[in-house]
Amino acid sequence: MRRQVMNSGARPTATPSTIIAPISGLNIRDPLANMQSRYALVLDNFFPRASDLQLRKGYVLYSSCYDIDKKDRPPFVRLLSYAPATYKGNCLFAVSDEGFIKLDTNKNTAPVLKIDSPATNGLWQSVNFSNGGGDWLWCCCGDGVNKARVYDGTKWTILDSASTPALDYSTEWVDVCSFKRRLWLARRNSDVLYYLDVLAIAGVEKKENTTLYSLPLGSLWNRGGSIIKIMNLTLDSGSGADDYLCIFSTEGQVAVYKGNNPNNDNDWGLVGIYDIPKPLSANCFIKYGGDIILMTENGLLAFSEMFQTIEIKHSIMSSAIIHNAWLEAVDRLRLIGKEKGLTLQQVGQYCSLCLYGEQNMLICNFLHDFRSDGETGAYIQYVLNTESRAWCRFKDLHMSAFTNHRDSVYCVADRYFYKFWEGYTDNKNFITAIMKTAYMFPSGRGTNSRITLIRPTFQTQILDVKYSLVIDSDYKELQRLRTPRTMAVSPLGIWDEAIWDDAFWVGTPRVSQDWTTINHYIGKAISLRLKVAAKGQDIALVGFDLITQSGGMI
């Protein structure tokens, strides 16, 4: 007679578990022993999305502006977008210490070597401005040598006291902003704000028939300093949108005005003065919706949060979770400045912000090593997912400038022009990504664990996944990531040969899952460290499955 086998009650020796990819992004703030598993300690070249980590896309060469006969020509340091009301005539200008070069965003264009507008400095600011008489790209440098200029879609016009229309202080303008149908100007080493007549693109300051007006701000700023940036802020106060003009100082103070006509006291007034961390440079500001986002020496800042808050709180800064990494990047800028005899804000001119709305991506581009003659320096990027507020870091992108032009992002390095987030290689080179999860306790706090089997889950479309994986125990990295190995994925379906309903067709996202054994030091706290190398394929990390054996407390 058969009898049921009685359960001995023995505790299972191995337990399964699943870990999702750290989609909440990089975390350099929380204690290692108390960090949630949805965060990563290292996240290089992975972009955190809502449900996975995407291997960042690459860039493709669009045009070379490299002259083999003049190898010491200066690199590009700015990309300026000309975006007229009609699509016709839109273009990009790459700027170096030689001047402006017009770039065509049509793929595979011939090399471009012509200087459209000569200059001796590449650090320019610009604004697009339409006044009925044309669509203008208004540019200024403010170095005391290079004159302000405008581009109308066909030609450049230098603005100075002898031009038509005339402009005073042409070589001294360091920033320009469009607000309430006027152009507002900041003068080099000055705390005086200037503005032009409505719809005017130039003006002169004189006793009679003045067309260039001034508004002193020095008495409002108790920290001193000069104007570094002018931006407009749009907020909804509950009764409709309100527009404000925000004037930022080099010392970290902001004068905010509201109104339509600065020449009429009844239609113009000071809203308040606000203290913020010092901006890195005039090049480190960007509009995001109606808000102003800026890179400061203490982190990334959304000015609307300061504007609507009585006291400054560190937690409202978007970069609080990577605060220490941000400070290290700023300290690196200070070191570069010390070596070159430059201030932090002068070195900060080589840093920048770029918003890529289609990918919910905000790129904070940091100079990491100063250039030598004819070469772009080394750069790193801290990147924010603007939807989830998750951070990551991009590496191996030594781009001196990024810009969003007609919903695509372009970048420059040395004298080469690229389209970013295009394809799955870095100009035909491998893209390598590294991730390290937060430390976790598979068997509970205080109990030793041994991972006997592990299965990473990837989604990919074309090729096998090359990866390397190690396990770090008890907050120590005792193993190094080796050359990535290949994980096989399901074969692609071939017409007339594949089995219908079973095979995966080309372009279909496929799941890569392979159990593998892994050797590691037994410990209570476990972290997974992964390296992926890819060339020509889209890869997303979904998570990991683990088989764990539990041990004792010692």
Can you say where each PLM-predicted feature lies in the sequence?
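Beta-sheet-dominated scaffold domains
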Residues: 232-428
